[in-house]
Amino acid sequence: MNKTVALFGSTGLIGSEILKQLIHDDDYETINVITRKKVTVQSKKIKNYIIDFTNLDGYKKVIKKGDVVIASIGTTQSKVNFNKSEYRKVDYNILLNLAKACKSNDASSLSFVSSAGANAKNKNFYLKLKGEIENSIIQLDLKSCLIFRPSLLLGKRNEFRFGEMIAQKIMPLFSFLMKSDYKPIKAVDVAKSIVNECKKKNKGYKFYHFDDILKVV
């Protein structure tokens, strides 16, 4: 397997857990962490590349042939002042440019975090957008693309989200009533499953829901 992984999105709940897993995983020698500003996590494995996420050429410079690429990129409505156009620039445009660079530079695989319920025909803005980016990336016909669809993530964020904090306390109490795809899941388990699946020689497109994720932790 390739000893180099390129990680886009290393500070969020899942991204930070992915970085921890990669640092302690002997199968990877080099972690290219691509960010907007310098990372604070220290490791001999880490090489930090700061790029302009709005420029496609920036992605092409840091993604190399054969790289394993992982993306855990996203924003929130509050961060973009509830501007749907700005939200789309992050959750759709950035990820699509990243995927295009994977295609043109012949990356071995792309794994990214989507959402349970993602559907381009959904009336919900968030789920519709997630479905649209999934469809757009699938149309690129990458060598290998792993799409992870967790529901509510359990774990401690660096930032405070009141609504999510309440949901994290309440939803697990009723998870036995939910369909498995929509059950809350630990962010660390999602991260472990992504890192583990990246080591396999998967071909084409594969979706991972709640049960699928827990099977490969």
Model regions: which residues?
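Structural motif
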Residues: 4, 67-68, 109
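N-terminal Rossmann NAD(P)H-binding glycine-rich loop of SDR-like oxidoreductase domains
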Residues: 3-25
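NAD(P)H-binding glycine-rich loop region in Rossmannoid oxidoreductase-like domains
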Residues: 46-97, 101-104, 198
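Oxidoreductase cofactor-interface core, primarily capturing Rossmann-like NAD(P)-dependent enzymes
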Residues: 24, 120-217
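Conserved Rossmann-fold NAD(P)-dependent oxidoreductase catalytic core, especially the SDR/UDP-sugar
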Residues: 8, 35, 84, 89-132, ...
